[in-house]
């Protein structure tokens, strides 16, 4: 009878009883220590990722342009290799 009386007075489900009636906002979601006393890791939000490439036409032409390619022997080899392969665009 004690089990029946306890179930009538307390929470109706076992999971709600384990959470102590705080089923709306568990402590783990709020960043408070969990059942073992360890703080839960927070997700790092607001950290910008994937924005490493910021295109600049000036830098692109200076590094890979026609004048820069022909100014060095290795650049001439690049142009000749692309001509041999049949590339439509030889440089930027």
From Swiss-Prot:
Residues 1-46 form a transit peptide. The keyword Zinc does not apply. Keywords: Mitochondrion, Phosphoprotein, Ribonucleoprotein, Ribosomal protein, Transit peptide. It comes from the Eukaryota. InterPro entries: Ribosomal_bL34 (IPR000271). Its main location: mitochondrion. GO terms for molecular function: structural constituent of ribosome. GO terms for cellular component: mitochondrial inner membrane; mitochondrial large ribosomal subunit; mitochondrial ribosome; mitochondrion. It is found in: Mitochondrion. One of its GO terms (biological process) is mitochondrial translation. The keyword Ribosomal protein applies. Pfam families: Ribosomal_L34. The modification Phosphoserine is found at residue 71. Component of the mitochondrial large ribosomal subunit (mt-LSU). Mature mammalian 55S mitochondrial ribosomes consist of a small (28S) and a large (39S) subunit. The 28S small subunit contains a 12S ribosomal RNA (12S mt-rRNA) and 30 different proteins. The 39S large subunit contains a 16S rRNA (16S mt-rRNA), a copy of mitochondrial valine transfer RNA (mt-tRNA(Val)), which plays an integral structural role, and 52 different proteins. Belongs to the bacterial ribosomal protein bL34 family. This is Large ribosomal subunit protein bL34m. It comes from Homo sapiens (Human). The lineage of its organism: Eukaryota, Metazoa, Chordata, Craniata, Vertebrata.
